[in-house]
């Protein structure tokens, strides 16, 4: 049975809040703690983007996505493609928080034989829709899925969500997918663009300026909505809720989501050096203390 999960509490035996926004914030804190712990244990990974995307993923899995907890391949589920696969620690921790994988499995991030690799691999983990790797591929995959779903024999209202980083907008493949989706008016496609303005070696606007992103997407036939604070659950839930009705407009939707890389850890926030640098034991301890772990 499909559901939008709002009642999964498998990390801390604490009575959950009732308010919808508080619920997302509750899960977000737990997810961040797991990200810090798993990256410190692995000794490698991408903390900044992972921490910045937590609220986006929490809103999707605890409010928006339709999925069947008993069947990851349910043919009525919504689809999520994570094009910026290096941020997968956030996805893995969210899957654990939602009760879809065992939280103990998070300890094995990037280990030989683990299902939780440095980029999501669908052949290992059934809750994934695609395998990621080179940046720029995910939106093309998502657009193909959305196009296929629209042409199924039976009527359906399934949606495809694709998380894309602003850094990978350097890739030409992204813009081919943007034009394709606009041409075919794929109203069942939502692109969530993680605008955190960092890449491995610096700021996005210094490495490859992207210009007026909203205008570029609109010019290709997309609806565009700006999310000024992509770590604010209220703003995210409002934007994602509005996306539910966007199919009446017959255009794909781009949510330009301005997140804080390293969110929740003061010494990591907005610092591009943490794009691909893991935390050592002392740094992890400081980060966890800021997240309320004593």
Regions found by a protein language model. Give the residues of each.
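Cofactor-binding active-site loop characterized by glycine-rich and histidine/acidic residues
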Residues: 35-38, 50-183
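Glycine/aspartate-rich loop-and-adjacent alpha/beta segment that forms the canonical ThDP
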Residues: 233, 237-294
């Amino acid at each position: 049975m499909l559901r939008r999960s709002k009642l999964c509490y498998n990390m801390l035996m604490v009575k959950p809040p009732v308010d919808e926004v508080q619920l997302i914030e509750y899960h977000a804190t737990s997810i961040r703690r797991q990200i810090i712990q798993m990256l410190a244990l692995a000794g490698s990974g991408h903390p900044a983007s992972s921490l910045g995307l937590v609220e986006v993923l929490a809103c999707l899995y605890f409010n928006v996505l339709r999925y069947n907890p008993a069947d990851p391949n349910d043919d009525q589920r919504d689809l999520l493609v994570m094009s910026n696969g290096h941020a997968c620690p956030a996805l893995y921790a969210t899957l654990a928080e939602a009760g879809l994988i065992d939280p103990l499995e998070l300890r094995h991030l990037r280990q030989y034989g683990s299902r939780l690799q440095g980029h999501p691999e669908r052949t290992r983990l059934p809750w994934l829709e695609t395998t990621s790797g080179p940046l720029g591929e995910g939106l093309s995959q998502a657009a193909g899925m959305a196009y296929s779903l629209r042409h199924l024999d039976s009527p359906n209202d399934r949606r495809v969500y694709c998380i894309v980083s602003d850094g990978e907008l350097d890739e030409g493949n992204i813009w081919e997918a943007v034009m394709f989706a606009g041409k075919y008016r794929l109203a069942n496609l939502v692109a969530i663009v993680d605008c955190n303005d960092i890449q491995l070696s610096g700021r996005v606007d210094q490495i490859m300026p992207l210009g007026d992103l909203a205008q570029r997407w609109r010019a290709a036939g997309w609806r565009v909505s700006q999310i000024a604070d992509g770590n604010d659950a209220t703003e995210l839930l409002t934007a994602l809720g509005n996306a539910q009705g966007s199919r009446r407009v017959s255009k794909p939707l781009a949510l330009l989501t301005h997140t804080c890389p390293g969110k929740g850890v003061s010494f990591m926030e907005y610092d591009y050096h943490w794009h691909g640098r893991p935390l050592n034991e002392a740094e992890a301890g400081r980060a966890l203390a800021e997240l309320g772990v004593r």
